[in-house]
Protein backbone atom coordinates (compact mmCIF):
# COMPACT_ATOMS: atom_id res chain seq x y z
CA UNK A 1 0.00 0.00 0.00
CA UNK A 2 1.45 3.37 -1.05
CA UNK A 3 1.97 6.15 1.46
CA UNK A 4 -0.79 8.66 1.75
CA UNK A 5 -0.48 11.94 -0.07
CA UNK A 6 -0.19 15.36 1.52
CA UNK A 7 -2.83 18.06 1.36
CA UNK A 8 -1.36 21.45 0.49
CA UNK A 9 -3.48 24.49 1.29
CA UNK A 10 -2.05 26.99 -1.18
CA UNK A 11 -2.68 30.71 -0.85
CA UNK A 12 -2.72 32.41 -4.24
CA UNK A 13 -2.78 36.01 -3.11
CA UNK A 14 -5.39 38.61 -4.03
CA UNK A 15 -5.59 38.09 -7.79
CA UNK A 16 -2.46 39.20 -9.60
CA UNK A 17 -0.56 36.04 -10.65
CA UNK A 18 2.70 37.88 -9.95
CA UNK A 19 1.71 38.08 -6.27
CA UNK A 20 1.71 34.28 -5.98
CA UNK A 21 4.64 33.42 -3.71
CA UNK A 22 7.65 31.47 -4.96
CA UNK A 23 6.73 28.57 -2.68
CA UNK A 24 3.11 28.53 -3.81
CA UNK A 25 4.19 28.45 -7.46
CA UNK A 26 6.53 25.53 -6.78
CA UNK A 27 3.93 23.53 -4.85
CA UNK A 28 1.33 24.06 -7.58
CA UNK A 29 3.75 22.90 -10.26
CA UNK A 30 4.83 19.80 -8.31
CA UNK A 31 1.39 18.66 -7.13
CA UNK A 32 -0.16 15.51 -8.56
CA UNK A 33 -3.63 17.03 -8.26
CA UNK A 34 -4.73 20.67 -8.30
CA UNK A 35 -8.16 21.36 -6.78
CA UNK A 36 -10.09 24.63 -6.86
CA UNK A 37 -13.56 26.01 -6.22
CA UNK A 38 -15.97 27.94 -8.38
CA UNK A 39 -19.50 29.28 -8.23
CA UNK A 40 -22.25 27.47 -10.21
CA UNK A 41 -21.29 29.40 -13.37
CA UNK A 42 -18.13 27.26 -13.49
CA UNK A 43 -15.50 29.98 -13.84
CA UNK A 44 -12.81 29.52 -11.18
CA UNK A 45 -10.95 32.66 -10.16
CA UNK A 46 -8.44 30.50 -8.29
CA UNK A 47 -7.56 28.47 -11.37
CA UNK A 48 -7.16 31.63 -13.40
CA UNK A 49 -4.60 32.97 -10.93
CA UNK A 50 -2.72 29.66 -10.78
CA UNK A 51 -2.78 28.92 -14.52
CA UNK A 52 0.76 30.18 -15.25
CA UNK A 53 2.11 27.65 -12.75
CA UNK A 54 0.18 24.55 -13.85
CA UNK A 55 1.98 21.85 -15.82
CA UNK A 56 0.67 19.54 -18.51
CA UNK A 57 -0.74 16.24 -17.32
CA UNK A 58 -1.79 17.35 -13.87
CA UNK A 59 -5.06 16.03 -12.56
CA UNK A 60 -7.61 18.71 -11.71
CA UNK A 61 -10.56 18.64 -9.32
CA UNK A 62 -13.11 21.34 -10.05
CA UNK A 63 -15.27 21.80 -6.95
CA UNK A 64 -18.42 23.62 -8.03
CA UNK A 65 -20.55 25.17 -5.31
CA UNK A 66 -24.20 24.18 -5.80
CA UNK A 67 -25.37 27.57 -4.55
CA UNK A 68 -23.86 30.90 -3.50
CA UNK A 69 -26.44 33.66 -3.11
CA UNK A 70 -29.32 32.20 -5.08
CA UNK A 71 -32.23 30.15 -3.74
CA UNK A 72 -32.08 26.36 -3.43
CA UNK A 73 -34.68 23.60 -3.33
CA UNK A 74 -32.47 21.40 -1.17
CA UNK A 75 -34.58 19.94 1.69
CA UNK A 76 -31.99 21.22 4.17
CA UNK A 77 -31.98 24.69 2.67
CA UNK A 78 -28.79 26.65 2.04
CA UNK A 79 -26.93 25.06 4.97
CA UNK A 80 -27.96 21.57 3.89
CA UNK A 81 -26.85 22.14 0.31
CA UNK A 82 -23.43 23.33 1.43
CA UNK A 83 -23.00 20.49 3.91
CA UNK A 84 -23.65 17.95 1.15
CA UNK A 85 -21.21 19.79 -1.12
CA UNK A 86 -18.44 19.80 1.48
CA UNK A 87 -18.99 16.12 2.24
CA UNK A 88 -18.72 15.23 -1.47
CA UNK A 89 -15.68 17.47 -2.01
CA UNK A 90 -13.98 15.98 1.04
CA UNK A 91 -14.33 12.47 -0.32
CA UNK A 92 -13.13 13.47 -3.78
CA UNK A 93 -9.95 14.95 -2.31
CA UNK A 94 -9.57 12.04 0.15
CA UNK A 95 -9.63 9.55 -2.73
CA UNK A 96 -6.52 11.15 -4.20
CA UNK A 97 -4.76 11.39 -0.84
CA UNK A 98 -5.51 7.74 -0.05
CA UNK A 99 -3.96 6.82 -3.40
CA UNK A 100 -0.73 8.57 -2.43
CA UNK A 101 -1.26 11.64 -4.60
CA UNK A 102 -0.32 15.07 -3.27
CA UNK A 103 -3.15 17.59 -3.65
CA UNK A 104 -2.75 21.37 -3.94
CA UNK A 105 -6.08 22.86 -2.87
CA UNK A 106 -6.07 26.45 -4.07
CA UNK A 107 -7.38 29.43 -2.13
CA UNK A 108 -7.62 33.07 -3.16
CA UNK A 109 -5.78 35.26 -0.66
CA UNK A 110 -4.62 33.23 2.33
CA UNK A 111 -5.94 29.69 2.99
CA UNK A 112 -6.86 30.44 6.62
CA UNK A 113 -8.32 33.93 6.15
CA UNK A 114 -12.05 33.80 5.30
CA UNK A 115 -11.29 31.10 2.73
CA UNK A 116 -13.26 28.26 1.17
CA UNK A 117 -10.25 26.05 1.84
CA UNK A 118 -10.89 26.04 5.59
CA UNK A 119 -14.11 24.03 5.29
CA UNK A 120 -12.25 21.14 3.70
CA UNK A 121 -9.18 21.58 5.89
CA UNK A 122 -11.14 20.87 9.07
CA UNK A 123 -12.63 17.74 7.55
CA UNK A 124 -9.51 16.33 5.89
CA UNK A 125 -6.94 16.97 8.62
CA UNK A 126 -8.69 14.42 10.81
CA UNK A 127 -7.27 11.79 8.44
CA UNK A 128 -4.44 13.35 6.44
CA UNK A 129 -1.38 15.51 6.86
CA UNK A 130 -1.82 19.10 5.69
CA UNK A 131 0.67 21.89 5.00
CA UNK A 132 -0.37 25.52 4.66
CA UNK A 133 1.30 27.85 2.17
CA UNK A 134 0.32 31.37 3.24
CA UNK A 135 -0.68 33.97 0.69
CA UNK A 136 -0.92 37.73 0.38
CA UNK A 137 -4.33 38.75 1.69
CA UNK A 138 -6.82 41.08 0.04
CA UNK A 139 -6.25 43.45 2.96
CA UNK A 140 -2.62 43.97 1.96
CA UNK A 141 -3.51 44.38 -1.71
CA UNK A 142 -6.27 46.86 -0.95
CA UNK A 143 -4.01 48.86 1.34
CA UNK A 144 -1.47 49.07 -1.47
CA UNK A 145 -4.20 50.20 -3.87
CA UNK A 146 -5.38 52.95 -1.53
CA UNK A 147 -1.74 53.96 -0.90
CA UNK A 148 -2.63 55.36 2.53
CA UNK A 149 -1.08 54.08 5.78
CA UNK A 150 -3.51 51.61 7.29
CA UNK A 151 -2.21 51.29 10.86
CA UNK A 152 0.79 52.69 12.70
CA UNK A 153 2.32 52.56 16.16
CA UNK A 154 0.00 50.95 18.66
CA UNK A 155 -3.16 51.35 16.58
CA UNK A 156 -5.31 48.21 16.37
CA UNK A 157 -6.62 46.91 13.04
CA UNK A 158 -10.07 45.31 13.12
CA UNK A 159 -11.06 42.98 10.28
CA UNK A 160 -14.84 42.59 10.12
CA UNK A 161 -17.18 40.53 7.92
CA UNK A 162 -19.77 42.66 6.17
CA UNK A 163 -22.37 40.04 7.01
CA UNK A 164 -22.52 41.20 10.65
CA UNK A 165 -25.80 42.81 11.76
CA UNK A 166 -25.82 46.57 11.15
CA UNK A 167 -25.88 47.42 14.86
CA UNK A 168 -22.92 45.20 15.68
CA UNK A 169 -20.97 46.43 12.67
CA UNK A 170 -21.66 50.04 13.66
CA UNK A 171 -20.41 49.43 17.20
CA UNK A 172 -17.23 47.71 16.08
CA UNK A 173 -16.43 50.36 13.48
CA UNK A 174 -16.93 53.13 16.03
CA UNK A 175 -14.59 51.35 18.45
CA UNK A 176 -11.85 50.63 15.89
CA UNK A 177 -8.60 52.51 15.39
CA UNK A 178 -8.60 51.21 11.82
CA UNK A 179 -10.83 48.68 10.11
CA UNK A 180 -11.30 46.57 7.02
CA UNK A 181 -14.72 45.16 6.13
CA UNK A 182 -14.64 42.09 3.88
CA UNK A 183 -17.38 39.95 2.32
CA UNK A 184 -19.21 42.81 0.68
CA UNK A 185 -21.34 41.97 -2.35
CA UNK A 186 -24.99 42.16 -1.33
CA UNK A 187 -24.02 43.22 2.19
CA UNK A 188 -22.67 46.58 1.05
CA UNK A 189 -25.93 48.39 1.82
CA UNK A 190 -25.58 47.38 5.48
CA UNK A 191 -21.88 48.24 5.53
CA UNK A 192 -22.60 51.69 4.14
CA UNK A 193 -25.34 52.17 6.73
CA UNK A 194 -22.95 51.17 9.54
CA UNK A 195 -20.23 53.51 8.27
CA UNK A 196 -22.74 56.34 8.11
CA UNK A 197 -24.18 55.61 11.57
CA UNK A 198 -20.70 55.62 13.10
CA UNK A 199 -19.85 58.93 11.40
CA UNK A 200 -17.08 57.34 9.35
CA UNK A 201 -18.50 57.07 5.83
CA UNK A 202 -16.51 60.07 4.64
CA UNK A 203 -13.24 58.48 5.83
CA UNK A 204 -13.70 55.05 4.23
CA UNK A 205 -12.43 53.71 0.92
CA UNK A 206 -13.96 51.05 -1.30
CA UNK A 207 -11.59 48.69 -3.12
CA UNK A 208 -12.82 46.25 -5.76
CA UNK A 209 -10.81 43.32 -7.15
CA UNK A 210 -7.56 44.57 -5.65
CA UNK A 211 -4.36 43.89 -7.65
CA UNK A 212 -6.22 42.72 -10.79
CA UNK A 213 -6.87 44.44 -14.11
CA UNK A 214 -10.39 45.18 -12.85
CA UNK A 215 -9.23 46.98 -9.71
CA UNK A 216 -11.25 50.04 -8.66
CA UNK A 217 -10.73 52.40 -5.72
CA UNK A 218 -13.50 54.81 -4.74
CA UNK A 219 -14.66 56.78 -1.72
CA UNK A 220 -17.05 54.45 0.09
CA UNK A 221 -19.79 57.08 -0.13
CA UNK A 222 -19.66 57.10 -3.97
CA UNK A 223 -20.23 53.39 -4.59
CA UNK A 224 -23.26 52.08 -6.47
CA UNK A 225 -24.31 49.41 -3.99
CA UNK A 226 -26.25 47.48 -6.66
CA UNK A 227 -23.04 46.48 -8.47
CA UNK A 228 -20.66 45.51 -5.66
CA UNK A 229 -18.94 42.14 -6.21
CA UNK A 230 -18.02 39.71 -3.46
CA UNK A 231 -14.32 40.34 -4.10
CA UNK A 232 -14.32 43.85 -2.69
CA UNK A 233 -13.79 45.45 0.69
CA UNK A 234 -14.21 48.69 2.61
CA UNK A 235 -11.15 50.19 4.27
CA UNK A 236 -11.02 52.68 7.13
CA UNK A 237 -7.41 53.81 7.70
CA UNK A 238 -6.24 54.73 11.17
CA UNK A 239 -5.17 58.17 12.29
CA UNK A 240 -8.18 60.01 10.88
CA UNK A 241 -10.02 61.01 14.06
CA UNK A 242 -7.39 63.29 15.57
CA UNK A 243 -7.81 65.85 12.80
CA UNK A 244 -11.59 65.70 13.12
CA UNK A 245 -11.55 66.30 16.86
CA UNK A 246 -9.24 69.31 16.98
CA UNK A 247 -10.66 72.32 18.75
CA UNK A 248 -12.69 70.17 21.12
CA UNK A 249 -12.73 69.21 24.77
CA UNK A 250 -13.92 65.72 25.68
CA UNK A 251 -14.60 65.29 29.39
CA UNK A 252 -13.92 61.57 29.74
CA UNK A 253 -15.11 59.28 32.50
CA UNK A 254 -12.63 56.55 33.41
CA UNK A 255 -15.06 54.58 35.55
CA UNK A 256 -14.33 53.63 39.16
CA UNK A 257 -10.80 52.38 38.56
CA UNK A 258 -10.08 49.11 36.77
CA UNK A 259 -9.56 49.36 33.02
CA UNK A 260 -12.10 46.56 32.49
CA UNK A 261 -14.76 49.04 33.61
CA UNK A 262 -13.69 51.71 31.12
CA UNK A 263 -16.02 52.02 28.12
CA UNK A 264 -14.83 51.64 24.52
CA UNK A 265 -15.96 55.21 23.84
CA UNK A 266 -13.75 56.52 26.65
CA UNK A 267 -10.77 54.55 25.31
CA UNK A 268 -11.41 55.94 21.84
CA UNK A 269 -11.52 59.53 23.06
CA UNK A 270 -8.34 59.13 25.10
CA UNK A 271 -6.51 57.62 22.13
CA UNK A 272 -7.58 60.46 19.82
CA UNK A 273 -6.57 63.30 22.14
CA UNK A 274 -3.49 65.43 21.61
CA UNK A 275 -3.56 66.64 25.23
CA UNK A 276 -4.66 64.93 28.45
CA UNK A 277 -5.59 67.01 31.51
CA UNK A 278 -6.44 65.75 34.96
CA UNK A 279 -5.55 64.89 38.50
CA UNK A 280 -2.21 63.10 38.45
CA UNK A 281 -3.63 59.93 39.98
CA UNK A 282 -6.27 59.70 37.27
CA UNK A 283 -3.82 60.38 34.44
CA UNK A 284 -1.68 57.52 35.71
CA UNK A 285 -4.58 55.20 34.84
CA UNK A 286 -4.47 56.26 31.17
CA UNK A 287 -2.20 54.44 28.73
CA UNK A 288 0.78 56.51 27.58
CA UNK A 289 0.78 57.20 23.84
CA UNK A 290 3.56 58.71 21.76
CA UNK A 291 2.97 62.33 20.85
CA UNK A 292 0.37 63.06 23.52
CA UNK A 293 1.03 65.82 26.02
CA UNK A 294 0.00 65.36 29.66
CA UNK A 295 -0.97 68.16 32.02
CA UNK A 296 -1.22 66.70 35.55
CA UNK A 297 -2.36 68.66 38.61
CA UNK A 298 -3.53 68.11 42.16
CA UNK A 299 -7.12 67.18 42.94
CA UNK A 300 -8.44 70.57 44.04
CA UNK A 301 -8.10 73.24 41.35
CA UNK A 302 -10.85 72.22 38.94
CA UNK A 303 -11.37 75.74 37.47
CA UNK A 304 -7.69 75.92 36.49
CA UNK A 305 -7.92 72.57 34.70
CA UNK A 306 -11.05 73.72 32.88
CA UNK A 307 -9.38 76.97 31.77
CA UNK A 308 -6.34 75.09 30.49
CA UNK A 309 -8.56 72.66 28.56
CA UNK A 310 -10.51 75.43 26.84
CA UNK A 311 -7.34 77.40 26.10
CA UNK A 312 -5.68 74.41 24.42
CA UNK A 313 -8.83 73.56 22.45
CA UNK A 314 -9.05 77.17 21.28
CA UNK A 315 -5.56 76.68 19.84
CA UNK A 316 -6.83 73.74 17.78
CA UNK A 317 -5.84 70.93 20.13
CA UNK A 318 -7.95 67.82 20.78
CA UNK A 319 -8.21 67.84 24.57
CA UNK A 320 -9.38 65.10 26.92
CA UNK A 321 -10.09 66.02 30.54
CA UNK A 322 -10.18 62.86 32.64
CA UNK A 323 -12.42 62.15 35.62
CA UNK A 324 -12.77 59.10 37.79
CA UNK A 325 -16.21 57.53 37.69
CA UNK A 326 -18.70 59.48 35.58
CA UNK A 327 -17.54 63.01 34.68
CA UNK A 328 -21.01 64.43 35.25
CA UNK A 329 -21.32 63.18 38.85
CA UNK A 330 -19.37 65.42 41.27
CA UNK A 331 -16.59 65.63 38.68
CA UNK A 332 -15.05 67.74 35.91
CA UNK A 333 -17.91 68.07 33.40
CA UNK A 334 -19.56 70.93 35.31
CA UNK A 335 -16.32 72.90 35.66
CA UNK A 336 -15.47 72.54 31.97
CA UNK A 337 -18.96 73.48 30.76
CA UNK A 338 -19.01 76.48 33.07
CA UNK A 339 -15.65 77.68 31.74
CA UNK A 340 -16.63 76.93 28.13
CA UNK A 341 -19.33 79.62 28.29
CA UNK A 342 -16.44 82.07 27.91
CA UNK A 343 -15.03 80.23 24.86
CA UNK A 344 -17.69 80.26 22.09
CA UNK A 345 -15.40 78.52 19.60
CA UNK A 346 -14.72 75.50 21.82
CA UNK A 347 -16.94 72.43 21.56
CA UNK A 348 -17.37 70.30 24.68
CA UNK A 349 -18.50 66.69 24.74
CA UNK A 350 -19.16 64.68 27.90
CA UNK A 351 -18.28 60.97 27.71
CA UNK A 352 -20.24 59.05 30.37
CA UNK A 353 -18.94 56.18 32.46
CA UNK A 354 -19.82 53.86 35.32
CA UNK A 355 -20.32 55.67 38.63
CA UNK A 356 -18.87 54.75 42.01
CA UNK A 357 -22.41 54.26 43.31
CA UNK A 358 -23.11 51.65 40.65
CA UNK A 359 -19.84 49.89 41.40
CA UNK A 360 -20.43 49.67 45.15
CA UNK A 361 -24.07 48.65 44.68
CA UNK A 362 -23.02 45.78 42.42
CA UNK A 363 -20.90 44.24 45.17
CA UNK A 364 -23.89 43.59 47.43
CA UNK A 365 -26.71 43.21 44.92
CA UNK A 366 -29.22 45.92 44.05
CA UNK A 367 -29.63 48.49 46.83
CA UNK A 368 -30.35 51.15 44.19
CA UNK A 369 -33.21 49.14 42.70
CA UNK A 370 -35.83 51.79 43.54
CA UNK A 371 -35.83 55.60 43.79
CA UNK A 372 -32.64 57.01 45.26
CA UNK A 373 -30.85 60.31 45.81
CA UNK A 374 -27.17 61.09 45.32
CA UNK A 375 -25.69 63.56 47.84
CA UNK A 376 -22.15 64.74 48.52
CA UNK A 377 -21.21 65.39 52.15
CA UNK A 378 -18.38 67.73 51.17
CA UNK A 379 -19.00 71.27 52.40
CA UNK A 380 -16.13 72.70 50.36
CA UNK A 381 -18.47 73.99 47.64
CA UNK A 382 -21.77 74.24 49.52
CA UNK A 383 -22.63 75.00 53.17
CA UNK A 384 -23.49 72.26 55.64
CA UNK A 385 -26.99 73.60 56.29
CA UNK A 386 -27.84 72.96 52.62
CA UNK A 387 -26.46 69.42 52.88
CA UNK A 388 -28.40 68.81 56.10
CA UNK A 389 -31.64 70.07 54.56
CA UNK A 390 -31.23 67.74 51.58
CA UNK A 391 -30.41 64.76 53.77
CA UNK A 392 -33.51 65.45 55.86
CA UNK A 393 -35.74 65.83 52.80
CA UNK A 394 -34.44 62.64 51.19
CA UNK A 395 -34.81 60.71 54.45
CA UNK A 396 -38.37 61.97 54.93
CA UNK A 397 -39.17 60.92 51.35
CA UNK A 398 -37.88 57.41 52.15
CA UNK A 399 -35.28 57.47 49.38
CA UNK A 400 -32.21 55.26 49.31
CA UNK A 401 -29.14 57.51 49.61
CA UNK A 402 -25.83 57.22 47.77
CA UNK A 403 -23.37 59.33 49.76
CA UNK A 404 -20.29 60.67 47.97
CA UNK A 405 -17.27 62.37 49.59
CA UNK A 406 -18.28 61.28 53.10
CA UNK A 407 -15.04 62.32 54.84
CA UNK A 408 -11.48 63.49 54.31
CA UNK A 409 -8.37 64.12 56.38
CA UNK A 410 -9.60 67.58 57.37
CA UNK A 411 -13.34 66.87 57.30
CA UNK A 412 -14.29 64.17 59.80
CA UNK A 413 -17.52 65.12 61.55
CA UNK A 414 -20.08 65.04 58.72
CA UNK A 415 -20.66 61.26 58.79
CA UNK A 416 -21.69 61.36 62.43
CA UNK A 417 -23.94 64.36 61.83
CA UNK A 418 -25.53 62.60 58.86
CA UNK A 419 -26.18 59.47 60.92
CA UNK A 420 -28.02 61.47 63.59
CA UNK A 421 -30.13 63.28 61.00
CA UNK A 422 -31.13 60.03 59.33
CA UNK A 423 -31.93 58.25 62.60
CA UNK A 424 -34.67 60.81 63.13
CA UNK A 425 -36.43 59.31 60.09
CA UNK A 426 -35.03 55.80 59.66
CA UNK A 427 -35.11 52.58 61.64
CA UNK A 428 -31.74 52.05 63.41
CA UNK A 429 -31.46 48.66 61.74
CA UNK A 430 -31.56 49.98 58.18
CA UNK A 431 -28.53 48.66 56.23
CA UNK A 432 -25.68 50.94 55.26
CA UNK A 433 -23.29 49.65 52.59
CA UNK A 434 -19.72 50.87 53.07
CA UNK A 435 -17.64 50.48 49.91
CA UNK A 436 -13.94 51.33 49.96
CA UNK A 437 -11.70 51.20 46.86
CA UNK A 438 -14.24 49.35 44.69
CA UNK A 439 -12.57 49.64 41.33
CA UNK A 440 -13.06 46.62 39.08
CA UNK A 441 -14.95 43.44 38.17
CA UNK A 442 -12.76 41.47 40.58
CA UNK A 443 -12.20 42.62 44.15
CA UNK A 444 -8.76 44.17 44.55
CA UNK A 445 -6.39 43.74 47.50
CA UNK A 446 -7.37 47.13 48.99
CA UNK A 447 -11.10 46.73 48.51
CA UNK A 448 -13.38 46.47 51.52
CA UNK A 449 -17.17 46.23 51.29
CA UNK A 450 -19.23 45.80 54.44
CA UNK A 451 -22.84 46.21 55.52
CA UNK A 452 -23.70 47.64 58.94
CA UNK A 453 -26.83 48.89 60.66
CA UNK A 454 -27.36 52.63 60.51
CA UNK A 455 -27.08 52.86 64.30
CA UNK A 456 -23.70 51.08 64.12
CA UNK A 457 -22.15 53.33 61.45
CA UNK A 458 -18.79 54.41 62.88
CA UNK A 459 -17.50 57.73 61.47
CA UNK A 460 -13.93 56.81 62.43
CA UNK A 461 -13.99 54.00 59.83
CA UNK A 462 -14.98 56.27 56.92
CA UNK A 463 -12.62 58.25 54.67
CA UNK A 464 -12.47 59.81 51.19
CA UNK A 465 -12.01 56.43 49.55
CA UNK A 466 -15.46 55.32 50.73
CA UNK A 467 -18.90 55.55 49.22
CA UNK A 468 -21.95 54.88 51.40
CA UNK A 469 -25.36 53.56 50.38
CA UNK A 470 -28.07 54.03 53.03
CA UNK A 471 -31.16 51.88 52.58
CA UNK A 472 -34.81 52.97 52.68
CA UNK A 473 -37.60 51.44 54.77
CA UNK A 474 -38.06 48.84 52.03
CA UNK A 475 -34.41 47.85 51.55
CA UNK A 476 -33.77 44.25 52.55
CA UNK A 477 -30.59 42.65 53.85
CA UNK A 478 -29.72 38.99 54.21
CA UNK A 479 -26.69 36.72 54.01
CA UNK A 480 -25.83 33.77 51.78
CA UNK A 481 -22.67 31.78 52.53
CA UNK A 482 -21.44 34.63 54.76
CA UNK A 483 -21.90 37.12 51.92
CA UNK A 484 -24.16 40.14 52.48
CA UNK A 485 -26.91 40.67 49.94
CA UNK A 486 -28.83 43.95 49.88
CA UNK A 487 -31.64 44.97 47.55
CA UNK A 488 -34.45 47.50 47.34
CA UNK A 489 -37.60 46.08 45.69
CA UNK A 490 -39.05 47.87 42.68
CA UNK A 491 -42.52 47.78 44.22
CA UNK A 492 -43.58 50.09 47.07
CA UNK A 493 -46.52 49.70 49.50
CA UNK A 494 -49.66 51.55 48.52
CA UNK A 495 -50.43 54.84 50.28
CA UNK A 496 -52.13 54.30 53.63
CA UNK A 497 -50.99 50.71 53.91
CA UNK A 498 -48.72 49.82 56.81
CA UNK A 499 -45.01 50.07 56.00
CA UNK A 500 -43.75 48.32 59.05
CA UNK A 501 -41.57 45.92 57.07
CA UNK A 502 -38.11 46.46 58.45
CA UNK A 503 -35.05 46.41 56.29
CA UNK A 504 -32.69 45.12 58.94
CA UNK A 505 -31.81 41.48 58.98
CA UNK A 506 -33.27 39.41 61.78
CA UNK A 507 -31.52 39.59 65.12
CA UNK A 508 -29.55 36.56 66.13
From Swiss-Prot:
Enzyme type, top EC level: transferase
Disordered: annotated segments: 489-508
Catalyzed reaction equations: precorrin-2 + S-adenosyl-L-methionine = precorrin-3A + S-adenosyl-L-homocysteine + H(+); precorrin-3B + S-adenosyl-L-methionine = precorrin-4 + S-adenosyl-L-homocysteine + 3 H(+)
Region (Precorrin-2 C20-methyltransferase): 1-243
Keyword NADP: no
GO cellular component assignments: plasma membrane
Statement: the UniProt record of this protein carries the keyword NAD: no
Protein name in the entry: Cobalamin biosynthesis protein CobIJ
Organism of origin: Mycobacterium tuberculosis (strain ATCC 25618 / H37Rv)
Lineage: Bacteria, Bacillati, Actinomycetota, Actinomycetes, Mycobacteriales
Amino acid sequence: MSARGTLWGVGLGPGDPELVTVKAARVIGEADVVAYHSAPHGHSIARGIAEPYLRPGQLEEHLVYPVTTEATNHPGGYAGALEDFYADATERIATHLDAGRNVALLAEGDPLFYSSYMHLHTRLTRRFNAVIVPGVTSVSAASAAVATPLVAGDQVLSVLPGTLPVGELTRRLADADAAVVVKLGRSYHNVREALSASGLLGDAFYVERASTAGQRVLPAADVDETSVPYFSLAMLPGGRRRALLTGTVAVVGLGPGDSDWMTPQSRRELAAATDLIGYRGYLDRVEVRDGQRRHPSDNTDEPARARLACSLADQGRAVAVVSSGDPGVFAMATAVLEEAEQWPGVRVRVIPAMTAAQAVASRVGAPLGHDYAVISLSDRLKPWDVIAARLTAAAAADLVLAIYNPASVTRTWQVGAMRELLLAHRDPGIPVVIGRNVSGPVSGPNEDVRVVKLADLNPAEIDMRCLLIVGSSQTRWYSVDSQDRVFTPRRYPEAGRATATKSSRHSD
